[in-house]
Amino acid sequence: MRRKNFMGPAALGMAVSLSLGMPATALAVTPEFGRSAEEWETLRDNVLEYGEIEDLVYEYNVTVRNNSQELNKFDNRTGRRESKTHSDAVGEYLRAANDAWSAYENAQDGATAAQSLVAAKQNEKAAEDQVLEGDRNAQLLQYKQTEKGIAKQAQAAMNTYFQLQYQLSSLEKNRDFLAASVTSAQGRQSQGMATYADVLNAQQALQNGEAQIIAMKSQIEDTRQNLIVMLGWKQGDMPEIRPIPAVDMGKIAAMNVETDTSKAIAADYTLQLDQKSFDNSNSEANREIYRKKVENDKQEIAIAVNDGYQKVLQAKNGYDEAVLNVEVETKNWNAANIKYQLGSISRIEYLQAETNLVKAQMDKEVKNLELFQAIETYDWIVKGVR
């Protein structure tokens, strides 16, 4: 995905001299040296491929970039320190501070008092830093959850974009059939075989079909714009959008609800955040609240994994049915083609069979994408994003 005007700080000066009038409109989160030249080339080639979406979200999504900047500001304000288990460390430092204050109050000489005062303040500062570090860890988890949620949303949007394209093809084929139906109705009316009302009905059906196409094209463009903006392009940009990869049927066979539920519980962002809140609670009442939240999270995760698996199976059945329907409509079209060549059916009957075949083919492609999306949704649940 190339952005000639998206580059890291290291390349900015040279780019200005080479591309006057093309200011950088967005910078990647990662410094230029953080990826290889080949990786940057892939992300900046003005081509959107499905496998690039997570990296594009990380580097160029506005929300993710803003969150990264906020985290950097937090680190600059507080300084980032690696910590022990948060609640244990805070407790240790506070106990040490209390002991130091007691020693200060009971000191028999000035030197001991001074040392105790320094120790008390140092431990209080360390406890405060631990609280800040706990806040940072929670903030980092929240930001990562947001980032992955946007990536999931972008993947689904790309899938929808192609589903709509197939649906548009089906509508356009149907529009052609409806146009032929109008011509047929007019011809039959001139022969006294159809009424004026029949012609009007055919014309109305054609108008409705054309309106559906206009609405579908608008929906496709809205989806396209939303997709590319999520990934750092502007609405008016026209990157090439490559097809979504083929469904890996082996993934379905490899799914194990019990094992995957354990993985999902370990990875779930909401559960991790609630667990942190439980660990850091300073009252029994709060601990009880978050204990219930943690248990509820685990139950919801188990339900989500099972539901996700069932939706994969349903999508697979839907795809299999669509494949069979294509076979049926192909046979029907072959038969209609022979009959049409022999003159035993009308052109409109032949076009109806042809239209049914195209609709079946497009429906199969849509069902294929629905299956792909069901598998991806399941995978996201296992990776901690519900």
Per-range role (PLM):
Residues 217-259, 375-386:
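Short, solvent-exposed, mixed-charge loop/turn linkers that connect secondary-structure elements
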Residues 30-50, 242, 294, 301, ...:
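Acidic, low-complexity, intrinsically disordered peripheral segments
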Residues 47-50, 54-64, 108-134, 234-295, ...:
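Amphipathic alpha-helical coiled-coil scaffold segments and their short linker/junction regions
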Residues 75, 82, 89, 96, ...:
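Coiled-coil heptad-register positions
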Residues 28-156:
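Short flexible linkers and secondary-structure junctions
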Residues 67, 74, 128, 166-215, ...:
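Charged, solvent-exposed structural "stalk/scaffold" segments
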Residues 1-27:
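Sec-dependent N-terminal signal peptides of Gram-positive bacterial secreted proteins and lipoproteins
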